[in-house]
């Protein structure tokens, strides 16, 4: 019976060793997972920093060269994006270069002839105001779009036309005194 007890004790101690070695193996595996997780997070963090062009000066020269190449590539992509935005804003997307403006008088102010004129889309609305001042030989002229609101003089005529055109014409009403509240 002593042999049986000794073998049981050996098997129990062996199983404890297996369990302890298994837990060591599991803990090593968990540590590796944690290290990989930390490494992955650090890599993601460094990628984000390089996208923001915040490069750490303490890194090795190889990684800094790679980041500089990445930053240069991102700058090129930003420049191409700006160029495409500028080309689309200059009317290369099919929008007309000049738009039709229809003038309507309000009240006792004289009407101008012709009542329809063309203007470039990139001009500010102040150009229309100065045109009316010259044409009517008046200093104070109040302009309204579609008889509803007075645009800011710095507003782009092309933007106003895109948003408020009626039958491909921007209707500009004008008068010598304030017409609407």
Curated annotation (Swiss-Prot):
The entry's keywords: Autophagy, Isopeptide bond, Membrane, Protein transport, Transport, Ubl conjugation pathway
InterPro entries xrefs: Atg12, Ubiquitin-like_domsf
Family: Belongs to the ATG12 family.
Quaternary structure annotation from Swiss-Prot or TrEMBL: Forms a conjugate with ATG5.
Extent of Basic and acidic residues compositional bias: 27-40
Cellular-component GO terms for this entry: Atg12-Atg5-Atg16 complex; autophagosome membrane; cytosol; phagophore assembly site membrane
Major location category of this protein: membrane
One record GO biological process: glycophagy
Name of the gene encoding the protein in the UniProt record: ATG12
Function noted in UniProt: Ubiquitin-like protein involved in cytoplasm to vacuole transport (Cvt), autophagy vesicles formation, mitophagy, and nucleophagy. Conjugation with ATG5 through a ubiquitin-like conjugating system involving also ATG7 as an E1-like activating enzyme and ATG10 as an E2-like conjugating enzyme, is essential for its function. The ATG12-ATG5 conjugate functions as an E3-like enzyme which is required for lipidation of ATG8 and ATG8 association to the vesicle membranes.
Region (Disordered): 1-40
Membrane topology reported for the UniProt record: Peripheral membrane protein
Lineage: superkingdom: Eukaryota
GO molecular function: Atg8-family ligase activity; enzyme activator activity; protein tag activity
Protein known as: Ubiquitin-like protein ATG12
Cellular location(s): Preautophagosomal structure membrane
Keyword Repeat part of the UniProt annotation: no
UniProt crosslink position (Glycyl lysine isopeptide (Gly-Lys) (interchain with K-144 in ATG5)): 181
Source organism per UniProt: Candida glabrata (strain ATCC 2001 / BCRC 20586 / JCM 3761 / NBRC 0622 / NRRL Y-65 / CBS 138) (Yeast)
């Amino acid at each position: 019976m002593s042999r049986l007890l000794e073998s049981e004790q050996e098997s129990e101690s062996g199983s404890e060793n297996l369990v302890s070695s298994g837990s060591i193996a599991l803990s090593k595996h968990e540590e590796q997972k944690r290290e990989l997780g930390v490494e992955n997070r650090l890599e993601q963090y460094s990628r984000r920093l390089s996208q923001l062009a915040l490069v750490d000066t303490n890194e090795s020269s190889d990684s800094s060269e790679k980041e500089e190449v990445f930053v240069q590539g991102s700058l090129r992509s930003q420049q191409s994006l700006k160029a495409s935005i500028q080309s689309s804003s200059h009317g290369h997307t099919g929008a007309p270069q000049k738009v039709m403006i229809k003038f309507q008088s309000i009240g006792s102010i004289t009407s101008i002839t012709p009542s329809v004129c063309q203007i470039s889309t990139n001009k500010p609305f102040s150009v229309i105001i100065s045109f009316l001042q010259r044409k009517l030989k008046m200093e104070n002229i109040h302009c309204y779009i579609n008889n509803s609101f007075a645009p800011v003089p710095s507003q782009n005529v092309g933007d106003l036309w895109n948003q408020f055109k009626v039958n491909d014409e921007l209707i500009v009403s004008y008068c010598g005194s304030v017409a609407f509240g």
